[in-house]
Amino acid sequence: MKLNRTLVMWLVPILTASCVFGKDYQVRLEPSIMIPMRDGVKLSTDLYFPAEAKGQLPAVLLRTVYGKNKTFGWSGVHQLLVEQGYVVVIQDVRGRYESEGSYVVAEHRREDSYDTVDWLISQGWSNQKVGSAGCSYLGETQVILAAAKHPNHVAAVPMSAASGFYMPGRAWQSFSGGVFELAQTAGWFAASGSQLFYGPPAHIDRGQWFKTPQSRLFKMAPEVDFAAYLELLSTLPTHSLLERAQLPPSEYKSWITSAPDGKFFRNKDLAKPSDTFNVPSLFMDSWYDYGPAETIEMFKTFQRNAQSEQARNNQFLIIGPGTHCDYTESTDDAIVGARNLGDASLNYSALQLQWYDYWLKGKENAITEMPHIQYYVMGKNQWRNSEVWPLASTNYQKWYLSGKGKAQSRTGDGLLSLNLPDNDSRDSYVYDPADPVPSLGGHTCCTGSDTEAGGYDQSEIELRQDVLVYTSPVLIHGFEVTGELKAVLYVSSSALDTDFTVKLVDVYPTGEAYNIQEGAIRMRYRNSLSDSQLIEPGKIYQVEVALNVTSNYFAGGHKLRVEISSSNFPRWERNLNTGGNNYDETNWKTAQNTIYHSAIYPSHLVLPVIIESQ
């Protein structure tokens, strides 16, 4: 397949016509409309109307857990849509903020979203067409609405919505290889998981109260001292972290104590690979977000399981270089973490407006003529496009680990090459849960703390003796890596259970070592993410570590590097090495962990290298 390098040129005729939007309407708010669900529960909903607009209007629905009163101002596209003649509808989900009912994460969402669309199209102002919008949880609710298949839901733009799609062991992005996503999940439940119900006194009409200005002054989210968050995450046991912080009741404990692929997560109201879909969707995500691989799989599932040719032919995917919900406008100097990724300009608001215009207003424009897949190659700092995934020109290369047994730190002898090791060797290190390898950048969100996502220089971390470092010679020729990554390792441990972590790194000629992707495996889940099985100390096991997905150009003069250790904290919960439940324990053991590399035990990294047409 010849890679198309004219994407930016293709975007110009569409976006320049829409970069300066006329302001056709002012905004008129009808706040806190109580919309009834099929079981009688009412959900509080704000309707933002284009003032003075005549005739029937399309609606764009956002369903949020974060509070509808503040959602409208999160993105300029919401106001833009109203000004262009859309009714923007923002709803508190069941049990949150002004809405009635009990709040349980990932339940009642199909029926509630379906019933909300039913109510919208029953209104006299409706043109019978409803789109959906929003990022993160708001993207997730779009995916659930798509799975509900309401016939009047005609366009979706799920942004950073990977948590809405069930993949074994990655439900709600709470685990990686069986290792709990501690900072992200605890941080989210601390800020947004409260099950305390807010409401006015019984003698005051609920609907009328929420229409008063005074009601919008109340801050209903818990106060979280994130300045002390890292210290809190370091305490044990991990299943009672939020209780010790005296935060409101939430489902956090159920999350951390459930098997990564057990009944608890399987029964959650998430879109599943077996679901069918019938809504044209424009998926957006970022390489440094927590779930680009899940977003890609979701995109492919919407295509594969489409109920009509129209739906199948109108699934689109855009993946940029940023972090979670980082859809900034026309970024010509993209700094992601500390990594400069060049001119990643893309007018996301213009794309969304044209998407809704086509599907909800029937305006003829070129939006459906764009490539079905658009992705940003970091390092090369260029937009590319494709019609298939994996890319047709993918060549999976094995990069082997080798050395003479002293790969501890970047000053050691760990080597990464395309050649099988010519000697029988191994590298060992001591993993101490009391002194874990610190997280620095990476692929996470919602922590509320200083554990920010993105690309950062890992060279200081690579001086630790509990980090094995394998580095290639200086690359003579650069190459692009785009697609799913994995490491195949031969390992042993002195413990009954431990973790192994892997990080792919791009080493610049100036010495900076930027993280590209990372993954982990908890040894008890090496065979099944629903059934744990402890290991035999000293026995050698082959394990696969999924490193999600990326697109990065390793330029000539750079080096390819992989780090291996047993912790990445606080992103991932520390394994205490005891073989116990881990989440309810306060004692730990050190473990001697070993990576083997030889012709018999060929530990290696698998990279999807893109072969460019001459």
Label every PLM stretch briefly:
Residues 204, 208-240, 327, 333-614:
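C-terminal, loop-rich substrate-recognition/catalytic regions characterized by aromatic stacking residues
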Residues 51-122, 170-172, 178, 328-340, ...:
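Cap/lid segment of the alpha/beta-hydrolase catalytic domain
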Residues 21-55, 471-477, 531:
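N-terminal cap/lid segment of alpha/beta-hydrolase-fold proteins
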Residues 139-150:
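Short glycine-enriched nucleophile-adjacent loop
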Residues 293-315:
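Active-site-adjacent alpha-helix of alpha/beta-hydrolase-fold enzymes
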Residues 277, 283-285:
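Short beta-strand/loop motif that positions the catalytic acidic residue
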